[in-house]
C-alpha cells in the first residue's frame, strides 16, 4: 500500500528537506501563475517564450511532486504546506501529519481522515482511562 512506513523520528529528520522542496515548489507555482496571467495578451515570440516557460515550470512542479512521492511522503496541500507520512501508531496504520511552520511532527490522523481529524501524538501514547464496571473496586477506593 505504501512504499515506506515512518517513525516520528524519521519524519522529523525529513523536515529540513521538505521545507526546502516546498519553498522551491511555491516559487515555481508563483512564477507559473504569473506566466499564465501574461499569456492571453502575448503574441509571437513573447507568446512562444511564455509557453516554453509554462511547460518548464509545470515540469519542475511535477518533478518535485515525484521526488516527494519517492521519499514516501504525501503532499496534501502545497499552499498550506501539509504533508502526510504513513506511520504505525498504536498498531494501526495512520498518517503522521505535519504543517509547515511546525517545528516537528506532533499530530496524526486516520487514513480515512484529514487535517480536520488531526490528533496529538501524545494522545496515542496515553492509554485510555480504565473504567470501573459495576461490582469492581478501583485501586485506592
Which residue ranges define each predicted feature?
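Active-site oxyanion-binding pockets that recognize sulfate/phosphate
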Residues: 15-18, 47, 51
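Short amphipathic alpha-helical coiled-coil/interface segments
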Residues: 50-65
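Heptad-repeat coiled-coil alpha-helices
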Residues: 34, 38-41, 45-48, 70, ...
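Long, hydrophobic N-terminal alpha-helical segment
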Residues: 1-42
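Low-complexity, charged, repeat-rich alpha-helical/coil interaction segments
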Residues: 9, 46-49, 105-106
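Charged/polar positions within long, soluble alpha-helices
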Residues: 30, 37, 66-69, 73, ...
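Glycine-rich, aromatic-bearing surface loops/beta-hairpins
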Residues: 70-141
Amino acid at each position: 500500500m505504501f512504499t515506506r512506513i515512518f517513525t516520528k523520528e524519521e519524519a522529523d529528520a525529513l523536515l529540513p528537506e521538505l521545507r526546502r522542496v516546498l519553498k522551491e515548489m511555491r516559487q515555481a507555482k508563483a512564477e507559473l501563475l504569473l506566466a499564465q496571467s501574461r499569456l492571453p495578451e502575448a503574441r509571437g515570440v513573447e507568446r512562444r517564450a511564455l509557453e516554453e516557460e509554462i511547460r518548464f515550470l509545470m515540469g519542475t512542479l511535477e518533478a518535485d511532486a515525484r521526488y516527494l512521492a519517492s521519499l514516501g511522503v504525501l503532499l496534501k496541500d502545497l499552499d498550506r504546506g501539509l504533508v502526510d507520512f504513513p506511520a504505525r501508531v498504536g498498531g494501526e496504520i495512520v498518517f503522521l501529519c505535519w504543517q509547515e511552520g511546525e517545528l516537528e511532527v506532533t499530530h496524526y490522523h486516520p487514513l480515512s481522515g484529514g487535517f480536520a481529524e488531526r490528533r496529538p501524538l501524545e494522545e496515542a501514547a496515553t492509554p485510555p482511562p480504565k473504567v470501573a464496571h459495576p461490582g469492581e473496586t478501583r485501586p485506592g477506593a
